[in-house]
Curated annotation (Swiss-Prot):
Membrane topology per record: Multi-pass membrane protein
Source organism of the structure: Salmonella typhimurium (strain LT2 / SGSC1412 / ATCC 700720)
Membrane-spanning residues: 1-21, 29-49, 58-78, 82-102
Biological process annotations from GO: monoatomic ion transport; transmembrane transport
Protein name in UniProt: Guanidinium exporter
Residues on Periplasmic side: 50-57, 103-105
Gene: gdx
Compartment annotation: Cell inner membrane
Domain of life, per lineage: Bacteria
Amino acid sequence: MSWIILLIAGLLEVVWAVGLKYTHGFSRLTPSIITITAMVISMALLSWAMKTLPVGTAYAIWTGIGAVGAAITGILLLGESASPARLLSLGLIVAGIIGLKLSAH
C-alpha cells in the first residue's frame, strides 16, 4: 500500500510542479489554489508512505516521479524540447527509480 501512496504522491508532485508555471508567482487565484492543494496532499502522502518505506528510497522515487512527469508533461503539452540527450537522461532517471524499487526491503 505504501508504494501506491508514494506513486500518487509523485503524480501530485507533477501537478504542482507544472501548476507553478500557471500561478504566475502565485498571483492567479485558481491555479495557485490547485497548486498549493496538490503540494500539501503530495507532501502528506509522502510522509505517510515514509512510515514504512526507507526515507532515502521514498524521497528519491518521489522526486524522480515528479521530475520525469514534469519533463514529459513539458514535452507533450508545453512544446518543450525532446532532444535525444534529454530523453536519455529521463530514461536514466526511470531506470534509477526502478532500481530503487527493486532493491527496497
